[in-house]
Amino acid sequence: VSIDLLKHLSNRYQEELKNISDDMAMGKAEDHGAYKYACGIYRGLLIANNIVAETAQNMQASEDE
């Protein structure tokens, strides 16, 4: 896995997070269930993005040694 790939994934996650955030701010959830679902997707993407960022940092630190 390359750091460039991890950066690309992180950028895509951030794009999706912004899209979901914008949709939620505009009230696009049809009901409470849809809102909860969007919140779950948002949280999952945040977790995935944090894991990718941490992995990239660890790889960068390994390369610097």
Predicted regions and their residues:
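N-terminal acidic leader/helix
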Residues: V1-G27
